[in-house]
């Protein structure tokens, strides 16, 4: 009888220990959904010689985001776009999301954009990337980013289109 009780106690301790090791470190997958609005604040137009209508655009985009929870923050994209005028192109660079408490998430981002087939917008875009660094409550972050977006038609005097993006960050935090 004592052997059976000892076995049950040891078995219970095993499951409790396993539970702490697997779930007690706070490393569970999480998701953040952001609605982002941004505008080009800096751009340089570099026509590619011998390829008519094609330009390389080093650029900076600044904007704001809101989470599903209502939390607000700001963002900055620094990157390059390759554009075949009127046909679309590709982009790549880095994003920094800055939260109200000072926490940050840094991501890579690459994607494509194309003309809106309905002609209502300047274009549509889709991209993805990796979460590569975090600070504050996002220290130790790793994960992925997916993004879909709409490029608004430019208004006279604007240096580039405003965008509205829906972004999903799937991540884990290392202890």
Task: Indicate residue ranges for each PLM-predicted region.
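Bacterial N-terminal signal peptides that target proteins for export
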Residues: 2-12
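Beta-strand-enriched cores of mature, soluble protein domains
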Residues: 26-175
